[in-house]
């Protein structure tokens, strides 16, 4: 059992968020959350992984949105808010479409968490309960990109681990 716990914890740390976008502050422009698997093994996200969003400074999050599919070892996985608009904006296909109003549809001042198979926060962007407007995690009309030297998941937000581009 201890071995299983250690292995599970190691696998959880291999997947983390690398980018969140709010292009043109519009859900029509293909908002998305990008995940990365830094591990040596593929990860089946349908085993309980999810994304969750806190909006407008609310202390209570929206419902967790289940992830599906598999993220390859060393690979990326894109969760978008609208597959057609994502394709029109970037010329690419997202891996999973959550739809408008869900965890991949942030207007740049929301807080987003990657939840592991046990429902705990594996990686956190922002501070739950805090409206991100005017803070170090606001990416309205822009994007938040994980810094190159920030290569592990963290359940606690640290602004120094991210490069933020916004209209303010």
Mark where each language-model region is.
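Activation on beta-sandwich/Ig-like modules and their edge loops
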Residues: 12-143, 147-149
């Amino acid at each position: 059992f201890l071995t299983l716990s250690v292995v599970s914890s190691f696998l959880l740390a291999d997947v983390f968020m690398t980018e969140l976008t709010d292009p043109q502050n519009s859900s029509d422009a293909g908002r998305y959350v990008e995940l990365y698997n830094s591990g040596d093994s593929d990860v089946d996200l349908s085993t309980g992984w999810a994304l969750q969003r806190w909006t407008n400074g609310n202390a209570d999050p929206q419902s967790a949105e289940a992830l599906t599919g598999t993220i390859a070892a060393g690979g990326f996985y894109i969760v978008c808010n609208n597959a057609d608009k994502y394709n029109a904006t970037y010329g690419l296909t997202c891996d999973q479409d959550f739809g408008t109003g869900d965890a991949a549809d942030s207007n740049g001042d929301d807080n987003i968490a990657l939840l592991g198979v046990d429902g705990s926060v594996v990686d956190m962007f922002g501070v739950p309960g805090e409206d991100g407007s005017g803070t170090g995690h606001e990416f309205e009309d822009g994007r938040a990109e994980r810094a190159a030297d920030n290569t592990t998941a963290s359940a606690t937000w640290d602004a120094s681990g991210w490069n933020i581009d916004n209209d303010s």
